[in-house]
Amino acid sequence: MSHRKFSAPRHGSLGFLPRKRSSRHRGKVKSFPKDDPSKPVHLTAFLGYKAGMTHIVREVDRPGSKVNKKEVVEAVTIVETPPMVVVGIVGYVETPRGLRTFKTVFAEHISDECKRRFYKNWHKSKKKAFTKYCKKWQDDAGKRQLDKDFSSMKKYCQVIRVLAHTQMRLLPLRQKKAHLMEIQVNGGTVAEKLDWARERLEQQVPVSQVFGQDEMIDVIGVTKGKGYKGVTSRWHTKKLPRKTHRGLRKVACIGAWHPARVAFSVARAGQKGYHHRTEINKKIYKIGQGYLIKDGKLIKNNASTDYDLSDKSINPLGGFVHYGEVTNDFVMLKGCVVGTKKRVLTLRKSLLVQTKRRALEKIDLKFIDTTSKFGHGRFQTVEEKKAFMGPLKKDRIAKEEGA
């Protein structure tokens, strides 16, 4: 900032340095919520996949506010959350230098989509992962060893986490390799946590057992990648005057002569996006149920409300752009979340005790928009579109060919 007439704050935060590509694709939970033994045993996190955005209409319940009892339109994000499968239990002991892994126990049967996570190239591999380990569950000596492991975990461990993976075959994605993560089990005693986890080995855990309606959660993920960007785009520094020699989307002064180095705090060109970020306080507007078969019929009606009784699913006409159809359970979050469509997101219970009125507000949805997100959508359902458009030429041609 040499020879400037007025002082000015620096551009861009130094709190997110180094701005480089994230080493991991899946958002990492760096701290779980504090354990409270008085609460029932529960999981503290879940994995989901970003499908896309839409908007909703709801009535605000905020007495004293100007918008109280008025309708508001708000943007929401749909995150598809198929049930996760528990495949292991990890026990931790507390040491003066933090937590240390004490024992890890895997389930007897582990699906191929989970085993793929342990291989670089599944196609060329012998696919032998866990073949020796699973025999522990079958012979007497192995069973005795497992019982011994569980009893020692009950005796020595302070923290219990479960290993759970997503079910990629239920999603409209090409990826076959499941995402695997450790999820901390909170509530109850250590013995109760272990019994809870042992009962759920190889079982599916739905998102409705982890989060509740109107809950505030945190979303952890990796942002959209933008590639190598110049200093103006990356740090939002001021453009130089038009007549500037050798370019104007630059930083004019990158430091003093001495020290004869460029300081780390000076804005420079480089990687933008694909950074690991944690966004706190995202409100759950709805936990929706996936498609289900009832009395031999496929029920898709998961976007109706008490005010909008039309039979429609959460999917917009033509599906979510660059994603497809959401057929499993989903979580509707207020506002936007990090990452591109199809990006895996880690949903975590809030670390804070929520006391604000906005956080505790009850959400009553009046309407969920399901118009096409590709262009200017006009119709909420296929039936509505057919009724408006009338018989189409392509329908007549198809009918003639069929006849």
Curated annotation (Swiss-Prot):
Pfam families: Ribosomal_L3. There is a cross-link at residue 294 (Glycyl lysine isopeptide (Lys-Gly) (interchain with G-Cter in SUMO1)). The keyword Transmembrane does not apply. It comes from the Eukaryota. Residues 18-31 have a biased composition (Basic residues). One of its GO terms (biological process) is translation. The modification N6-acetyllysine is found at residues 136, 286, 294, 366, 373. Residues 1-37 are annotated as: Disordered. Component of the large ribosomal subunit. The ribosome is a large ribonucleoprotein complex responsible for the synthesis of proteins in the cell. This is Large ribosomal subunit protein uL3. The gene is RPL3.
